[in-house]
Amino acid sequence: MFHLRTCAAKLRPLTASQTVKTFSQNKPAAIRTFQQIRCYSAPVAAEPFLSGTSSNYVEEMYCAWLENPKSVHKSWDIFFRNTNAGAPPGTAYQSPLSLSRSSLATMAHAQSLVEAQPNVDKLVEDHLAVQSLIRAYQIRGHHVAQLDPLGILDADLDSSVPADIISSTDKLGFYGLHESDLDKVFHLPTTTFIGGQEPALPLREIIRRLEMAYCQHIGVEFMFINDLEQCQWIRQKFETPGIMQFTNEEKRTLLARLVRSTRFEEFLQRKWSSEKRFGLEGCEVLIPALKTIIDMSSANGVDYVIMGMPHRGRLNVLANVIRKELEQIFCQFDSKLEAADEGSGDMKYHLGMYHRRINRVTDRNITLSLVANPSHLEAADPVVMGKTKAEQFYCGDTEGKKVMSILLHGDAAFAGQGIVYETFHLSDLPSYTTHGTVHVVVNNQIGFTTDPRMARSSPYPTDVARVVNAPIFHVNSDDPEAVMYVCKVAAEWRNTFHKDVVVDLVCYRRNGHNEMDEPMFTQPLMYKQIRKQKPVLQKYAELLVSQGVVNQPEYEEEISKYDKICEEAFTRSKDEKILHIKHWLDSPWPGFFTLDGQPRSMTCPSTGLEEDILTHIGNVASSVPVENFTIHGGLSRILKTRRELVTNRTVDWALAEYMAFGSLLKEGIHVRLSGQDVERGTFSHRHHVLHDQNVDKRTCIPMNHLWPNQAPYTVCNSSLSEYGVLGFELGFAMASPNALVLWEAQFGDFNNMAQCIIDQFICPGQAKWVRQNGIVLLLPHGMEGMGPEHSSARPERFLQMCNDDPDVLPNLQEENFDISQLYDCNWIVVNCSTPGNFFHVLRRQILLPFRKPLIVFTPKSLLRHPEARTSFDEMLPGTHFQRVIPEDGPAAQNPDKVKRLLFCTGKVYYDLTRERKARDMAEEVAITRIEQLSPFPFDLLLKEAQKYPNAELAWCQEEHKNQGYYDYVKPRLRTTIDRAKPVWYAGRDPAAAPATGNKKTHLTELQRFLDTAFDLDAFKKFS
């Protein structure tokens, strides 16, 4: 009866585990590897007695039949026999018959159904076997594709060979098929295109076409994608017979591009054989591959391509893809060339480039930008993505149809660097997506000297891309036409679905890691084979000559023509005496600087605002500008507090930030704030995105309701990534100087997760690449007893990387000294102690006539501190950011009586003033706050030191002595006063960890350094 009850269930498709047994069972080929399945021609409902109302009766009849088949009517006997034999219910049931001669014949026919069923089973199972075989090729065909041009290793490191698709009789046996089945014709499923216009094919032809599609020089990984339309699209591109065809003109273009790629490297080798250039030998096909992607994208409407790549083949890409003048490249090899620009410059294979030209294939304008990068592999990936996102944003390209990115990778780095994973996970996030990136992996099967088997645990270096359902196309780089086809498909995929795609160029490296390196030390067998390997240009030229596409003289003429171009450029390069790094800018800002790249002025206007603007922004910040929007009760109280502040003409930290952002939006400046939990704020103080408590996912951003024609405000919670997201925001800030781009760390302690971006891009970016950037880092910092991972943004590290000289007092009489200082520094480091100063420094960041990175150590406890308030009076027109906030209490009235002048920065000021008040030492101890640490305010601090002639000087900080600001401030203070006095220290003792995890210890340390700061005899023993 169970069988009858489950008739409907048997209509469902069988799972893979139900249909195919594992090959390891080693069953004889004749034994079926499929469970029996019924091919129903009528629905179960054809049997009226199988309804729920009759089930009890049917069960009784079935039990009786099991005990004695003769105990039930003959029609029941036939029905139960047919059903158990697998006949469909509509066929199994026979109406009760009379005992006429015709009735007996009909009954005999019904009885014969049972005997005929095995033939039906075989037919069904054979078709299922063929469908499973097709699916096996689609899923695992890439494992047996001929991808390695050297023929040494499989491109994947998976030691198991898919036995069900290898070219042997095992293939048939695995699916229960025989040699005799090879010429049988099978209907093709809808999930394959190998038939073209034919609905059925012989098994032999099915296998041949599958092997042509999936097991030649292209390996396709796509069946993990969970979108049927996308899978069908890929199947159609690779399975359709004859789809990979090229015209003779396309073949000649491909040959010409290979000539340029190959002869460029050979020219460099001839002229500068002992120079490092990280040549492309062994993967010369990369150049035509990139040009194909760009051609296809241009044809689809893309007019701006932003690229990122490592050093391998970079000069070739600059020369033959971006089309940088060859003489500008060649002159970089001249050791006598002088650098005319400020800054230190960088190696030629790190430089970027920006170029606008006509694409000759599509006859359309296209802009190409190659982003400069350090040697830190893959570090430029998120930077490229951020720049791409920004360019899309500024031109209103909401679908990525005009601007796109191409990222090049090495196989070892693509598998080994975590930033690749972080970047992939930004690809589909609404505020970070670039609507698809084409990734090209130069898979030369070695990482410097490391074998792939020691460099990754995954079969392919590209397996990381599977996490975002990106299709992966592996291709043998010694088959240029296969490479071109794959690149066309990749560009079409990106244009169609606006998702990432990976092209894995399986190639080799003809030389060592660089031209001076000896690879035979570590890869002797591989390099013996490489020495025998015929270059891909020679192979392809011979193929085209044999096909009659070109003749030998035409081929040789193409070579000599490009060689002549190189020689002429080499001659011109000798005339270059000065190296202008600015010619290698990857992100020019038209109109922002003068024609020679200088600021249009060296002044900064007031950063204050009219009171009506402050009031208007404050009112919007304390309201909900959308009707029928229910906010949380706790948020209502926060907005009420904001309204009271505005009424009282004061701001707290959150309101000061709001006013800075809102005023810039009014001036047409886009503001983008990104980071973990920034919409609400880690400390629940910001609340820039309001959530309706009654409607799911309904939100409101009041900042976008300030003015009728304001610039848009973007605030976006990021993924839990620092390295990737900070790199992304840096790239976003590269695109335009007229945007305030901020990244906020959840806690300042976590900025070191993005240390590479800070050390290699933000700090030295202008010095290396003459590229300014105005990104702002907001780093919550403060010793508040929260333990070693929630206390310190490591200010000592940022200050240690500042480029000013601690031992040289600058010319304090210079006109606009403060602005000149800002122009000369590599970044600005501030620690504001008031909301008003925070407001001013954010506005100054945009009003300056140039751009510098801004590092802000933001407070935590000050966000709600009752004394951390600023009056509107300090934010009105005529007010500025205060680099130093001097003492303004009783000590300032009688400076001669002051016995100690304490210098400090940030939150510790409030601890010091509280302690000073408790000790009643307001006339004896003056406290001066240094708000801008770098560039150091020598001029203002000199005035402060001179103001208190009888006071001893001390630096006070809450951080440990070997951390914080002391080592940076002390030598500069000493230089300021011409070393006339010592600069004493009041703060925590040196320590390995940034802070204690014990609350009592924290408070004890705090009181100890406060005692030192106000003990006027504390330093006498050292005098």
Swiss-Prot record:
The mitochondrial 2-oxoglutarate and 2-oxoadipate dehydrogenase complexes (OGDHC and OADHC, respectively) share their E2 (DLST) and E3 (dihydrolipoyl dehydrogenase or DLD) components, but the E1 component is specific to each complex (E1o and E1a (DHTK1), respectively). Coiled coil: none annotated. Calcium ions and ADP stimulate, whereas ATP and NADH reduce catalytic activity. Its cofactor is thiamine diphosphate; Mg(2+). CDD domains: TPP_E1_OGDC_like. The gene is Ogdh. Residues 1-40 form a transit peptide. Homodimer. The 2-oxoglutarate dehydrogenase complex is composed of OGDH (2-oxoglutarate dehydrogenase; E1), DLST (dihydrolipoamide succinyltransferase; E2),DLD (dihydrolipoamide dehydrogenase; E3) and the assembly factor KGD4. It contains multiple copies of the three enzymatic components (E1, E2 and E3). In the nucleus, the 2-oxoglutarate dehydrogenase complex associates with KAT2A. Interacts with ABHD11; this interaction maintains the functional lipoylation of the 2-oxoglutarate dehydrogenase complex. Its EC number is 1.2.4.2. One of its GO terms (molecular function) is oxoglutarate dehydrogenase (succinyl-transferring) activity. It catalyses: N(6)-[(R)-lipoyl]-L-lysyl-[protein] + 2-oxoglutarate + H(+) = N(6)-[(R)-S(8)-succinyldihydrolipoyl]-L-lysyl-[protein] + CO2. There is a cross-link at residue 534 (Glycyl lysine isopeptide (Lys-Gly) (interchain with G-Cter in ubiquitin)). InterPro entries: 2-oxogl_dehyd_N, 2oxoglutarate_DH_E1, DH_E1, KGD_C_sf, ODO-1/KGD_C, THDP-binding, Transketolase-like_Pyr-bd. Mg(2+) binds at residues 411, 444, 446. This is 2-oxoglutarate dehydrogenase complex component E1. Belongs to the alpha-ketoglutarate dehydrogenase family. The modification N6-succinyllysine is found at residues 74, 564. GO terms for cellular component: mitochondrial membrane; mitochondrion; nucleus; oxoglutarate dehydrogenase complex.
